[in-house]
Amino acid sequence: MIPAKFDYVKPSSVGEAVQALASGGEDAKVIAGGQSLLPLLRLRLSYPDLLVDVGALDELRGVADVGDELLIGARTTHYQLVHDPLVGEHCGILAEAAATVADPAVRHRGTLGGSLAHGDPAGDLPAVAVALGATMVARGLGGERRIAASDFFLDYLTTALQPGEILTGVRVPKLSGDWGYRYEKFHRTAQAWATVGVAALVRRSNGSVAEARIGLTNMGPTPLRATAAESAAAGAQASRDALRTAAASADEGTNPPGDLHGAPDYRRHLARVLTGRALAAAAGA
């Protein structure tokens, strides 16, 4: 299909982008790589009156070391996340998950900010951001605002970004200590959305799990933390059997969708199995 008619602006600065977006109110949308928004436009599931193209704003691109955190620009592509040395050193699970996104064409165009601002629970990076305890940096006419990833995703395709706000970056805490990680994903084809995905981070100490963080993809209307499984894994031996037992509670508190790709019970089963695998791999078991 052909998208509905809209006005188009391509600002030359973030300030101009904020002004343009504010002028359009709730009927304006931001586009960067377009890998999430363009399909919705073509299907007329989204029909903004104004499209604000931030694809030329280099100030929104790149990775910076800012002490205990990395500041990642919203326009940083999946491909750049995969290959950035700072990301690989300090939050490698983000690179690992980005490498599973769709196909090379999408990874070269799609952006971190677009994936997060789109708010699709089937996307790979929202669950990773939640597991990492990332903070979203938004900018509007009132200035800059920071939003914890745990508070950012409100409902299906709905985030805490207010009308007129642009996601400019993501602050990701550096992993300090003996951390391992794994992103496990089940999908029908390489290009498909995740039926279920699991982002697991494990801090190891003397052969045991000192701390576990688990983010779930496509197990509800938003990305989720598997808090019951996290608690069960903490203090457990870093062995496959012990972590598989901890993973048995990974689906507690979830509300997975049912569709052509999997019934809710099937997704709950996948969450338990993939969590066990991800925890074991992250723990080096």
Per-range role (PLM):
Residues 1-285:
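C-terminal structural segment of proteins
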